[in-house]
UniProtKB/Swiss-Prot annotation:
It comes from the Eukaryota. Belongs to the A9/FIL1 family. It is found in: Secreted. This is Male-cone protein 1.
Amino acid sequence: MAAPRSSAKSAALFAILLIVAAVQAEDCSNAMDKLAPCTSAVGLSSNGVKPSSECCDALKGTSTSCVCKSVRAVISLPAKCNLPALTCSGSR
């Protein structure tokens, strides 16, 4: 009888771990949309433009890992389009 009880405990523990992992997983699917108010501060013609309060609020509400994932996604676009890789040396 000990084996079924142990199996049930293991299954319950596994289910709890799955739930915790799902809760901790970040949803970064709309990170780029959230940061739309920042476009005027990061565009090519944004030399010295101060970010708006909306941009700063959006940035506060977006995790660093989501921002980084978004940047990596943009940088990976040329390869997905069969274009040369981005080289950003000498730029900020």
